Amino acid sequence: MGKTIMIVEDDQSFHDIYTEMLKDTDYEIIRAYDGAEALVKLGKEKPDLIILDMILGMMNGDTFFLYLKGMPEYKDLPVIIISSQSKRDYKSLKDVEPHIIFLDKTVTKEKLIEEINARIG
């Protein structure tokens, strides 16, 4: 069985785009539509990497990320943030900045797979 990626994204079309980009890989995909749902799913499944949108419904990406990194069992879990905003827009992430991989929403399939493989491939 391949490694597991959790996609935390509130927009169904972006879920579909990322899933399509990864369909020819061995990665299993878990979907969550906001940070709160992702936390519930983390109680049941442990992904090898999280792809995280920043602007979400119930719990935004920055809040989820900081909560996740505060949990000892997930502090080293790789997270790739995909957002239409830049990393500078998230002052709350300043202290963990060296550990953040930040990609634009227009990321190519090749770049996304390259970044994932560099972390868990």
Please report, for each region that a protein language model flagged, where it lies by residue.
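Acidic, metal-coordinating helix/loop segments flanking the phosphotransfer/catalytic sites
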Residues: 31-49
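Two-component/phosphorelay signaling modules centered on CheY-like receiver
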Residues: 12-30
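Alpha4 helix (beta4-alpha4-beta5 surface) of REC/receiver domains from two-component response regulators
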Residues: 63, 85-103, 109-114
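Residue-level signal for the "D+5" position in two-component response regulator receiver
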Residues: 31, 56-59
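Conserved acidic carboxylate
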Residues: 9
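Active-site residues of response regulator receiver
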Residues: 53
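Acidic catalytic/metal-coordinating carboxylates
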Residues: 34, 60-66
